[in-house]
Curated annotation (Swiss-Prot):
The gene is queF. One of its GO terms (biological process) is tRNA modification. InterPro entries: GTP-CH-I_C/QueF, NADPH_dep_7-cyano-7-deazaG_red, QueF, QueF_N, QueF_type2. This is NADPH-dependent 7-cyano-7-deazaguanine reductase. It comes from Yersinia pseudotuberculosis serotype O:1b (strain IP 31758). Substrate binds at residues 88-90, 228-229. GO terms for cellular component: cytoplasm. It catalyses: 7-aminomethyl-7-carbaguanine + 2 NADP(+) = 7-cyano-7-deazaguanine + 2 NADPH + 3 H(+). Belongs to the GTP cyclohydrolase I family. QueF type 2 subfamily.
Amino acid sequence: MSSYQNHKALAELTLGKPTAYCDHYDATLLQAVPRSMNREPLGLYPDNLPFHGADIWTLYELSWLNSNGLPQVAVGEISLNADSINLIESKSFKLYLNSFNQTIFADKESVRMTLQRDLAACAQGNVSVALYDLDEITGQPISNFNGECLDKQDIRIDSYEFNADYLQGAAGKDHVEESLVSHLLKSNCLITHQPDWGSVQIHYRGPQIDHEALLRYLVSFRHHNEFHEQCVERIFNDIMRFCQPETLTVYARYTRRGGLDINPWRSNTDFVPLTGRLARQ
């Protein structure tokens, strides 16, 4: 159980509670979760964050009415800066997007600007918003994380409780730069405990990390309850703490739920994330 499971900010969320669905625009549906909630137990504060990054959201169920009342659809891509005060709670984001369904907007740019304004206000940070017509993204190939996949190792695992100590002593003597990938990342929603399925890419330069130890560590998230963004920051923090690489990037892409997927990345070096969807997205 996370140390902040009973944080007062969580009690105020609609997540896990019966909810009415509103189809007319309502910015108040958005709900924020303070990033400090999980960062402070890790010793992370705004003036000493060891990373930069963003939470990339893909919006697959976005619709509104044009000035003639004709429904419009688009796919949205949101990038929320990791130094924002808050993250956006995903169920509230879904409810907020549903409120566009029967609302008239003059054009797609008006929708984009509304999203950017409201999300920035809720997160108290920088947000970029792009909206794509379907013919702009139709036919795009399925992407794949570059790197060596950890998942084919012939190892026996019988514990699925989170344990950062798997990384204790995992840093070897050889100095390398490598990208490691696992599709076995699975954690659970902090509130509902519904499963969150993801793939993760870890790129680092420094003492070589034992691949078996790293896979055991990632699998130990299987019963762990945290939001996507928090899991990625925990992975970054634990690898830095135990393995002390010179550079590190952690990027996870999660399967969609409620028409949204969340794809957080954190890095202490130059990094440009791929934004194409993976096979399970």
